[in-house]
């Protein structure tokens, strides 16, 4: 048994059965400026509070179980939820089978660990993708890690949504798949070693109001677009998301694009009436860059400081600067049949800058300055949030082990 900044680890004598206990706590402060007289609430928020249990049972089986006790993105209290509950059977690195509830295998930023994202909140690209779903996938790594793949069947959920239960809302399933290539991964001394690129996609059929996204949010987690309450998904849904990243020493970069399509009707069909359905295609892109001022390597899994912060010894951990641009555009056909002009933006453009201070492998302080501009079809919105640019200063204290 060992206990350190990576958590509590227990292992059998032969090492075939292991248990790791960890946690993730993210405490945020959100301050909004220029919102026209206190429209947005400045507040403290327990964004995430999770207990993490993972390990192995025998030679080929591993598991992950994560309950969520935090407030989530909305800033209001929530019930305890099972975030991840998955079992993986891995006969080889090339062929592994995963069953349960886990992140949908689509987006590069979405698949990044929640403690390791460059900014405290993900971009619009992740808003147009599902979060966690229930299903089964086959995954693996080939050619020494130069190519990895995932493909499988999942229940299927709306954009920016986590499956809330163990059952599906209709009789159909979604097919999810992703390919990721790192062609120079074997040459660690090459400046091309950190290049990665790939594509994720999903396709299926969905029916019901629950298959329509509950809304898209800004970096400050304010809803700027939401379909009408009666809008009914009925037919094909699909997503495609090309993606790439690059890491070289202290430099890191990540870029992603997504198209998310759904067929919808203004209301649910009845035995006598079925209003025409329309395919809507919403699109988003993002570019994120980072640089570690203290010289440590940037990576997809975060920054590990050479020396932890120690006032007496004069060591300061690692300091990273980050910046990003992002944009999301709603299909013009959404207005006004499926979304009201007065209460929704048709486009949101945002930029952000910030820094991350890694006091140790387990403790991180972050501060992000983020601004979002809205386009509202050339009309004056009635929603106060859309009348002004969103300017937010978000500070986070994070403990992760």
Where are these regions (language model features)?
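Outer membrane beta-barrel
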Residues: 3-207, 281-314, 318-336
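Outer-membrane beta-barrel pore domains
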Residues: 37-38, 88, 191-193, 201, ...
């Amino acid at each position: 048994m060992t206990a350190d900044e990576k958590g509590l680890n227990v292992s059998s004598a032969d090492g075939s059965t292991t248990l790791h206990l960890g946690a993730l706590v993210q405490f945020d402060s959100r301050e909004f400026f220029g919102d026209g007289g206190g429209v947005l609430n400045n507040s403290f928020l327990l964004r995430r509070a999770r207990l993490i249990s993972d390990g192995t049972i025998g030679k080929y089986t591993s598991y992950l179980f994560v309950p969520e006790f935090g407030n989530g993105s909305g800033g209001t209290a929530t019930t305890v939820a099972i975030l991840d509950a998955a079992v993986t059977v891995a006969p080889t690195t090339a062929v592994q089978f995963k069953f349960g509830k886990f992140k949908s295998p689509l987006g590069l930023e979405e698949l990044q660990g929640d403690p390791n994202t460059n900014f405290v909140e993900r971009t619009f690209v992740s808003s147009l993708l599902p979060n966690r779903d229930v299903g089964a996938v086959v995954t693996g790594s080939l050619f020494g890690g130069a190519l990895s793949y995932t493909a499988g069947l999942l229940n299927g959920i709306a954009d920016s949504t986590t499956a809330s239960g163990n059952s599906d809302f209709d009789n159909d399933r979604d097919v999810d798949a992703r390919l990721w290539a790192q062609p120079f991964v074997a040459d660690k001394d090459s400046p091309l070693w950190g290049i990665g690129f790939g594509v994720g996609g999903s396709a299926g059929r969905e029916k019901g109001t629950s298959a329509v996204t509950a809304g898209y949010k800004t970096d400050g987690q304010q809803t700027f677009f939401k379909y009408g309450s009666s809008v009914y998904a009925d037919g094909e849904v699909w997503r495609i998301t090309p993606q790439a990243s690059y890491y070289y020493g202290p430099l890191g970069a990540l870029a992603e694009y997504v198209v998310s399509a759904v067929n919808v009707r203004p209301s649910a069909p009845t035995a006598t009436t079925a209003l025409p359905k329309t395919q809507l295609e919403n699109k988003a892109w993002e570019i994120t860059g980072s640089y570690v001022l203290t010289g440590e390597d940037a990576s997809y899994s975060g920054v590990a400081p050479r020396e932890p912060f120690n006032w007496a010894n004069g060591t300061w951990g690692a300091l990273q600067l980050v910046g990003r641009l992002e944009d999301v555009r709603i299909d013009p056909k959404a207005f006004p049949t499926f979304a009201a002009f007065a209460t929704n933006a048709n486009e949101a453009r945002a930029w952000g800058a910030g820094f991350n201070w890694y006091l140790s492998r387990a403790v991180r302080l972050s501060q992000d300055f983020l601004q979002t501009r809205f386009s509202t079809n050339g009309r004056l919105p009635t929603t106060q949030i859309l009348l002004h640019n969103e300017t937010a200063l978000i500070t986070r204290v994070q403990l992760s082990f």
